[in-house]
Swiss-Prot record:
Gene: Hsf1
One MF annotation (Gene Ontology) recorded for this entry: chromatin binding
Family: Belongs to the HSF family.
Source organism phylogeny: Eukaryota, Metazoa, Chordata, Craniata, Vertebrata
Motif (9aaTAD): 408-416
Protein name (database record): Heat shock factor protein 1
Gene3D superfamilies hit by this protein: Winged helix-like DNA-binding domain superfamily/Winged helix DNA-binding domain
A Pfam family the protein falls into: Vert_HS_TF
Region (Hydrophobic repeat HR-A/B): 130-203
Ranges for region Hydrophobic repeat HR-C: 380-405
Length: 525
């Protein structure tokens, strides 16, 4: 017990308690069997560590763990001394462990103050470690700042690209809208060009002709291009007189005009069975009246941009106007060319004053006279509806389907080098043969005296829907087609004799292709 108290009383006060206890433990002679000084006094030996931990350590320390005792020695700078025999392969016979410290010497207790714990060295290592870590953290922060700057740059670029993408989408939408508008404009231009091409190929009328749906008591104004011309050969000598104001509307539709022979083309405004039309360029004194045969004309499909025309056929013998011809019977008679039609025969003549003339030889089959062709309202309305539906279908095709137009093809339409088969024009020979066949077998030829004996012959009106005249050169027309109007070939055929002079008649010059040179009539607007 004194040994335990002794160490607390001995030694200086600034020596650590572990060192004081260790000095007392080593210097105690009662424990020399387990712990004691070395013979030199520079170190101490610990024998039988197990027994030492069980019997000695609990007396001086709060534990009996040999490892903790060795760790405490290392903290104060004690080192384990290793001998040569302990480093061999043979285990030593005695368990002996020696520890030494330069300041822990036998008989020199005052040197215990120099023994310190290794706190300073540990703090130095920690500071160096902290400095190294600080450098690493600084480098990491620098790298993070660089990455942050690059990330901000990428964000700005992405934002700019997003704005540019939105601007591009808006521009694409605007361009699509403009493209749609331009496509509509192009479609309208194509329709306009097609209408121009059709108007250049077809002789147009300046204004629409009113429909003959009902009789009208008041006569309408005469069209600008309404004029009369004959389709048959004029017998007898005598040229046409010079054109006069007879082409005006007042003289053309006057009841006092002189009656002449030959088919007349004009506009029918009302039914006038007792008022025949006048021939524009002749008088009774200049030319005798001649008879003509009834003209059967096939009804061709009308051209959509123009109104139908009406042909007035004037046979040499006047006929009675008792039974008008219905359009259905007239069309059936046209289809049956070989069969006699009720409208092909002529009856007793009747002049404008109602006096009966001597009867002339007539065909064996009695036929009714050809009166004014009365248009059926239902048939005409059906025809107009069909035309409207065709125009609507064409407009739908042009507007709904996108297509491209070759400008060279449009320019070729105006070029004089274009061939007629490309334009699908009708056949001249077949059409001319058909009209001559219709003109010739109607009645046998009569002498000129019989024609002159009937000065006052009436006219019969024939409903005729003609194709509009094409403004083309007859010399350049290809006769291989099958649908061209027969009026082209009249100027080249032998229908007119070479001795007759028709240069003064504008209608004949229109058929022959020669334009008469005359001053413009001031009455024609």
């Amino acid at each position: 017990m004194d040994l335990a108290v002794g160490p607390g009383a001995a030694g200086p006060s600034n020596v650590p308690a572990f060192l004081t206890k260790l000095w007392t433990l080593v210097s105690d002679p009662d424990t020399d069997a387990l712990i004691c000084w070395s013979p030199s006094g520079n170190s101490f030996h610990v024998f039988d560590q197990g027994q030492f931990a069980k019997e000695v350590l609990p007396k001086y320390f709060k534990h009996n763990n040999m490892a903790s005792f060795v760790r405490q020695l290392n903290m104060y700078g004690f080192r384990k001394v290793v001998h040569i025999e302990q480093g061999g392969l043979v285990k030593p016979e005695r368990d002996d462990t020696e520890f030494q410290h330069p300041c822990f010497l036998r008989g020199q207790e005052q040197l215990l103050e120099n023994i310190k714990r290794k706190v300073t060295s540990v703090s130095t290592l920690k500071s160096e470690d902290i400095k190294i870590r600080q450098d690493s953290v600084t480098r990491l922060l620098t790298d993070v700042q660089l990455m942050k700057g690059k990330q901000e740059c990428m964000d700005s670029k992405l934002l700019a690209m997003k704005h540019e993408n939105e601007a591009l989408w808006r521009e694409v939408a605007s361009l699509r809208q403009k493209h749609a508008q331009q496509q509509k404009v192009v479609n309208k231009l194509i329709q306009f060009l097609i209408s121009l091409v059709q108007s250049n190929r077809i002789l147009g009328v300046k204004r629409k002709i009113p429909l003959m749906l009902s009789d009208s008591n008041s006569a309408h104004s005469v069209p600008k291009y309404g004029r009369q011309y004959s389709l048959e050969h004029v017998h007898g000598p005598g040229p046409y007189s010079a054109p006069s104001p007879a082409y005006s509307s007042s003289s053309l539709y006057s009841s006092d005009a002189v009656t002449s022979s030959g088919p007349i083309i004009s506009d029918i405004t009302e039914l006038a069975p007792t008022s025949p039309l006048a021939s524009p360029g002749r008088s009774i004194d200049e030319r005798p009246l001649s008879s003509s045969t009834l003209v059967r004309v096939k009804q061709e499909p009308p051209s959509p941009p123009h109104s139908p025309r009406v042909l007035e056929a004037s046979p040499g013998r006047p006929s009675s106007m008792d039974t008008p011809l219905s359009p259905t019977a007239f069309i059936d008679s046209i289809l049956r060319e070989s069969e006699p039609t009720p409208a092909a025969s002529n009856t007793a003549p009747m002049d404008t004053t109602g006096a009966q003339a001597p009867a002339l030889p007539t065909p064996s089959t009695p036929e009714k006279c050809l009166s004014v062709a009365c248009l059926d309202k239902n048939e005409l309305s059906d025809h107009l509806d069909a035309m409207d539906s065709n125009l609507d279908n064409l407009q739908t095709m042009l507007t709904s389907h996108g297509f491209s137009v070759d400008t060279s093809a449009l320019l070729d339409l105006f070029s004089p080098s274009v061939t007629m088969p490309d334009m699908s024009l009708p056949d001249l020979d077949s059409s001319l043969a058909s009209i001559q066949e219709l003109l010739s077998p109607q009645e046998p030829p009569r002498p000129i005296e019989a024609e002159n004996s009937n000065p006052d012959s009436g006219k019969q009106l024939v409903h005729y829907t003609a194709q509009p005249l094409f403004l083309l050169d007859p010399d350049a027309v290809d006769t291989g087609s099958s649908e061209l109007p027969v009026l082209f070939e009249l100027g080249e055929s032998s229908y007119f004799s070479e001795g007759d002079d028709y240069t003064d008649d504008p209608t004949i010059s229109l058929l022959t292709g020669t334009e008469p040179h005359k001053a413009k009539d001031p009455t024609v607007s």
